[in-house]
Amino acid sequence: MDQPAWKNPRTALIVDGSDAARQRRIPNLASVDLNLLVELEALLQYRNITHAAQHVGRSQPAMSRALSRLRDMFNDDLLVRGSSGLVPTPQAEHLAQMLPSVLNAIRELVSCSSGLRDLRSKVTMAMPDHQSLVLLPYLLPRLGERVPHVDIVTEPLLDGALRRLEQGEIDFAIGQIGAAPPGYLRRGLYADRFTCLLRHDHPALEQEWSVGTFAALRHASIASDSNEGLGQVYDGLVRFGLPGPIVVSNVLTAAVVVAMTDLVLMIPNRVATRVATMLPLAIVDPPVELKPYEVALIWHQRCHHDLEHRVLRREIAAAARMGRLDVSQDQRARRQNDS
């Protein structure tokens, strides 16, 4: 009586310890040459050794040796000679039904470019409110073209962002991030600096723009999302020794309030440039130079080589570059209008 492949002494074996198959022995994949499955697919398709060899780019003797190894692997003749060529055995016919789905799954598994447009997942990005305003208008259209089924969720950049990255609760964090701690990676996106927003007809714009003028104004500020150094972009106010500002929950609300009052708002230049295109606001440099800072992307090392994660990191960086270009163009246009 013929023995099944797993009883063949030439096949290495392991024991499946599950309750459902406690006594069943299955082949050890470490002893199986999966390339033989590609040759088997061609042999079953063409039922001719010469044609199958040509299909996979092998010589006829090499394909004959592959068939011999396949017969050993499955302990079955697989293909036998008939009056019109090779004829599959019942075992081979059964394999022919299973093989396409198995090989397609393997091809998808190892292909670095397959299925990107078919990715379906939710990606969570933690960033301050103002970074969403700057980045998402450039990022979302790019993702819509390249990975249309990936859903982007943004969250405030709260305390514990590094821990949440490690535990997989969020996928990315974006903000003022210095050197990446051990186990994390960092990519700089762009440099920014503080500028001031005032309503376009503010009386202070008719005066000398000095530290005294600036300090005499009532200030607005945006509530910081984080206390761990990742999202604090408004601490420049402290440099002037000013009294506590009127704190507003988000940047758009603050900008609308500034456009309708005599308040001044000091925010990153990219944000100021964006909101000044939507509201009647003027952008003025602070009367004292403030040190620029870098906005960076950070992620956990466990995701570093993940295909989807790599694609998203690339698209985030590309969106940041697009924003840099637009800001430069807006600044040139504003200087021309002022001249």
Swiss-Prot record:
This is HTH-type transcriptional regulator SyrM 2. Acts in trans to stimulate nod gene expression. Keywords: Activator, DNA-binding, Nodulation, Plasmid, Transcription, Transcription regulation. It comes from the Bacteria. Residues 32-89 form the HTH lysR-type domain. It holds the Pfam family LysR_substrate. PANTHER family: HTH-TYPE TRANSCRIPTIONAL REGULATOR LEUO-RELATED, TRANSCRIPTIONAL REGULATORY PROTEIN. Residues 49-68 bind DNA. GO terms for molecular function: DNA binding; DNA-binding transcription factor activity. InterPro entries: LysR-type_TF (IPR050389), LysR_subst-bd (IPR005119), Tscrpt_reg_HTH_LysR (IPR000847), WH-like_DNA-bd_sf (IPR036388), WH_DNA-bd_sf (IPR036390). Belongs to the LysR transcriptional regulatory family. It comes from Sinorhizobium fredii (strain NBRC 101917 / NGR234).
